[in-house]
């Protein structure tokens, strides 16, 4: 599914479910150390290249993503819905002008 389609679906869910007090958001994770990315990130040159184009200059950890998801599931985020949360550590952000 493309990013645009996922955002459209997230916003549609937010509108449909909001009347029931249910929020819907999407989280973009970038390169995070998981079983799925292990084969790519085990190549030192690739991992370095990813770090070099990430503002935080490191790869993501599962707990980085978990904290965002836990926040979105908490009462503190009850007014956030229909959003695309970029939890990538600033992956491929354009340099400052």
Residue ranges and their predicted role:
Residues 15-19, 78:
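Alpha-helical segment proximal to the catalytic Tyr-Lys
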Residues 7, 29-39:
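Short, flexible catalytic-loop segment of classical short-chain dehydrogenase/reductase
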Residues 23-33, 73, 86-88:
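Conserved SDR Rossmann-fold cofactor-binding beta-strand/turn motif
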Residues 70, 81-97:
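Short C-terminal tail/terminal secondary-structure segment
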Residues 3, 66:
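Conserved catalytic core of two-component sensor histidine kinases
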Residues 2, 10:
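Active-site helix of classical SDR
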